[in-house]
Amino acid sequence: MAQFDTEYQRLEASYSDSPPGEEDLLVHVAEGSKSPWHHIENLDLFFSRVYNLHQKNGFTCMLIGEIFELMQFLFVVAFTTFLVSCVDYDILFANKMVNHSLHPTEPVKVTLPDAFLPAQVCSARIQENGSLITILVIAGVFWIHRLIKFIYNICCYWEIHSFYLHALRIPMSALPYCTWQEVQARIVQTQKEHQICIHKRELTELDIYHRILRFQNYMVALVNKSLLPLRFRLPGLGEAVFFTRGLKYNFELILFWGPGSLFLNEWSLKAEYKRGGQRLELAQRLSNRILWIGIANFLLCPLILIWQILYAFFSYAEVLKREPGALGARCWSLYGRCYLRHFNELEHELQSRLNRGYKPASKYMNCFLSPLLTLLAKNGAFFAGSILAVLIALTIYDEDVLAVEHVLTTVTLLGVTVTVCRSFIPDQHMVFCPEQLLRVILAHIHYMPDHWQGNAHRSQTRDEFAQLFQYKAVFILEELLSPIVTPLILIFCLRPRALEIIDFFRNFTVEVVGVGDTCSFAQMDVRQHGHPQWLSAGQTEASVYQQAEDGKTELSLMHFAITNPGWQPPRESTAFLGFLKEQVQRDGAAASLAQGGLLPENALFTSIQSLQSESEPLSLIANVVAGSSCRGPPLPRDLQGSRHRAEVASALRSFSPLQPGQAPTGRAHSTMTGSGVDARTASSGSSVWEGQLQSLVLSEYASTEMSLHALYMHQLHKQQAQAEPERHLWHRRESDESGESAPDEGGEGARAPQSIPRSASYPCAAPRPGAPETTALHGGFQRRYGGITDPGTVPRAPSHFSRLPLGGWAEDGQSASRHPEPVPEEGSEDELPPQVHKV
């Protein structure tokens, strides 16, 4: 524990989420006028249940689904016990003859009930098996616990059912066809009538998201800052990512809601974690707790492993029989879902994005099939298919062939072999275009490391993308190994990071009026957590430690503003969005001039545009990606970025969401959700009673607008990164047992950091050519918005970039030691101000 020595920058609150004068507001309502939903104490749980009931399509569907989950667990346990103790496999495999007639020479047809043991024999065999009795007792206790929890949840969800009917005035029959934005708008309106939260007069969309996603935002931030041990370097296999549902459950149990966790309740961090005086003691306490939970996982490993195997067998056996190539399909990994998730992004919003990116991601991964593997698969399919064809022909000629021993088994195995081999044979009409596919993927998933662009054809890019988009078989294998690996990760990998986790929660927690303690990254404040290379130059005061990696703050802000057009961002965020809108207008105008004069019209590009319906917003993405490679003559690489950016900006200018009451035809004036007011605001933000069909169409336009902005912002980021004189490598310092400090970067004998490019936050320190247009962009941003401050904001001293929080940062040519100045320990706690600040 002596090596737990890190330096964290103090985080100041940047703006007030409440109107002026409401910071200490407590709304008083007369006793007789209170509604059943006045002053709900646990709004986190309440809003989460409101959201879950909406996603489960109403109370009836949720009730039936919960009942079937209970029955499913009971079925797995009972059916497994029956197979182990109540079946005579000698009769089933014809090793023992059964004769029901009086004449032994007569042939007898064996039926399935003949293989079942009598009830008395079955009961006796169960009672004689002590290990089986132990497993059944544990399973019974767990099932009773789930039953009690089910009854409690049903009572709570019945209250949510009444809230939908009477407060929101949404019948259960109409709920499956209502978008979440409609439900959320009615919740905001209900706050004015019933005062659900008494600490604020009005609720905002961000308040509701903070309540529902409080812990999820912390998890996204922990993954973004590489504090959780998810990446491992395996001998002979290289770098691998291991993140399963069981491991995630243990992380949440330790940090958020388990006994002895960091949080006092759903909305408040414990007071001792808000000060730095007891950080070492708290880290030791957290380390011990992680150790005990790891030991508990180790003791329960056999039971959990048995359950994982049985559940996987019963879940995927039928799928394999019906579709043998299903395990060759791919899915988004759990790490990928957490890495690609925006701050303040609900589960259905994330799932919608990933679903749109699934097909191009599958096509991209299919571009890298091994030629040798393809050759082996073709010949394997030929030999297995030939034998299978002969057996099928013989069966058609005489069905008695199936009565021959192992013929049916052989036919089944040969069919599976042919199906698996065909999955490794590429489509003969497939065109190898990885760069275009990667741009389409980026338009939907919104996050991508810098070094992937221009290197989409390389195997390294494919391997790194496979960590986000893995085989279904790999996903199942990781879940089966999770009971064994999880205790090892907790004990040997998570415990050394206890102090860094304690410091993270102290320094990145803010108290929002009417919401409680939230992750400061979830505020999406470009001044506190913006990155200069993501259009935040001149607006951010964050040190390199406080910056969110991969443009998470900027992209999350843009996504939330587009998804919730009625939301009014704070001043700095409004300035950021407004400046981006102006930049889009300038680049779009330049692209229009270039198309008219400098760039000749391309026939293929024109044909693609004519084939795409203008009423479909997704056609814009296809036009942008196709136009990047089809329009005009080939350009040098340094000029391709400008052309790509101009094309995306032109698409954004021509992109027009629907006006109220307008059919989805044609294009109109460009709109962008920069300040929270645009064409969609009048239809989806201000009116609660708009049509369901129009809401769905507007949602499609919003997702397409965000896809175009993701492409545009990544292109701007790429040009800004090239304009930097040098870029800095940031990596998390692994805890070592030696305790030796790293040499100064500017000192003699300094070593260059290990170059492992992974994302936008892992650039190599190398000089880059400047870009005059990006420098002008920075200067214009500083002139236009650099002087904006909030009234009442405490001025902050400039951050000292020479310090190395978490080990590994050094800027401006300054040297820094690995171990910074220590934080005062116990006894000086009164001298430290609280580390949680009201917002």
UniProtKB/Swiss-Prot annotation:
One GO biological process term: bone morphogenesis
Region (Disordered): 1-20, 656-686, 719-839
PTM statement from Swiss-Prot or TrEMBL: Ufmylated in a DDRGK1 dependent manner.
Intervals, Lumenal compartment: 85-128, 398-406
Modified-residue entries (Phosphoserine), positions: S14, S16, S18, S656, S735, S738, S741, S828
Predominant location category: membrane
Ranges per topology, Cytoplasmic: 2-61, 155-290, 302-319, 329-371, 425-470, 481-483, 493-839
Motif (Tyrosine-based sorting signal): 8-11
Record field: catalytic activity: a 1,2-diacyl-sn-glycero-3-phosphocholine(in) = a 1,2-diacyl-sn-glycero-3-phosphocholine(out); a 1,2-diacyl-sn-glycero-3-phospho-L-serine(in) = a 1,2-diacyl-sn-glycero-3-phospho-L-serine(out); a 1,2-diacyl-sn-glycero-3-phosphoethanolamine(in) = a 1,2-diacyl-sn-glycero-3-phosphoethanolamine(out)
Ranges that cross the membrane: 62-84, 129-154, 372-397, 407-424
Keyword Acetylation attributed: yes
Skewed-composition ranges (Acidic residues): 737-747, 823-832
UniProt feature, compositional bias: Basic and acidic residues: 724-736
UniProt entry keywords in alphabetical sequence: Acetylation, Autophagy, Cytoplasmic vesicle, Endoplasmic reticulum, Endosome, Glycoprotein, Golgi apparatus, Lipid transport, Membrane, Mitochondrion, Phosphoprotein, Transmembrane, Transmembrane helix, Transport, Ubl conjugation
GO cellular component annotations of the record: autophagosome membrane; endoplasmic reticulum membrane; Golgi apparatus; Golgi membrane; late endosome membrane; mitochondrial membrane; mitochondrion; phagophore assembly site membrane
One annotated GO molecular function: phospholipid scramblase activity
Modified residues (N-acetylalanine): A2
Family the entry assigns: Belongs to the ATG9 family.
Subunit text: Homotrimer; forms a homotrimer with a central pore that forms a path between the two membrane leaflets. Interacts (via cytoplasmic its C-terminus) with ATG2A. Interacts with SUPT20H. Interacts (via the tyrosine-based sorting signal motif) with AP4M1; promoting association with the AP-4 complex. Interacts with ARFIP1 and ARFIP2. Interacts with PI4K2A and PI4KB. Interacts with ATG4A; the interaction is direct and promotes ATG9A trafficking.
Function description: Phospholipid scramblase involved in autophagy by mediating autophagosomal membrane expansion. Cycles between the preautophagosomal structure/phagophore assembly site (PAS) and the cytoplasmic vesicle pool and supplies membrane for the growing autophagosome. Lipid scramblase activity plays a key role in preautophagosomal structure/phagophore assembly by distributing the phospholipids that arrive through ATG2 (ATG2A or ATG2B) from the cytoplasmic to the luminal leaflet of the bilayer, thereby driving autophagosomal membrane expansion.
Protein name as it appears in the record: Autophagy-related protein 9A
Native source species: Pongo abelii (Sumatran orangutan)
